[in-house]
């Protein structure tokens, strides 16, 4: 029974929590010209669409430059629009700098 529970997709068993949209995260988003609404949307989509299928490492595990490729690669599985991808990338790029 325990093995079955651990194998369920969509169950997050690690301790990773995506960082909130904070003043520091907003400041880190300046190179992407992302506003707080875009960052909040990106975080919400990340939580609802990415974390529903699998757990992810802390956002700091990847550099800001790696996130566009990673999101693009996974976007087909999550059926993400170009706008959703852009919001997620903006959030993850800023978040990856926030925790460093």
Regions of interest found by a model, annotated:
Residues 12-14:
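Bacterial signal peptide processing site
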Residues 7-10:
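C-terminal motif of bacterial Sec signal peptides marking the signal peptidase cleavage site
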Residues 78-100:
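C-terminal capping alpha-helices of c-type cytochrome domains
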Residues 17-44:
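Electrostatic cytochrome c docking/interface patches
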Residues 38-47, 60, 83, 99:
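Short sequence/structural segments immediately N-terminal
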Residues 47-56, 88:
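The canonical Cys-X-X-Cys-His
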Residues 1-4:
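Sec-dependent signal peptide recognition
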Residues 39-41, 55-78:
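Gly/Gly-Pro-rich "capping" loops immediately C-terminal to redox-active cysteine motifs
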């Amino acid at each position: 029974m325990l093995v079955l529970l651990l194998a369920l997709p969509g169950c997050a068993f690690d301790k990773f929590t995506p960082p909130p949209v904070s003043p520091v995260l907003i400041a880190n988003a300046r190179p992407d010209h992302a506003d707080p609404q875009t960052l909040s949307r990106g975080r919400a989509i990340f939580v609802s669409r990415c974390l529903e299928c699998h757990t992810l490492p802390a956002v700091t595990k990847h550099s800001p430059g790696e996130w566009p490729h990673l999101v693009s690669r996974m976007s087909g599985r999550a059926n993400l629009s170009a706008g959703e991808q852009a919001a997620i990338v903006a959030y993850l790029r800023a978040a990856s700098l926030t925790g460093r």
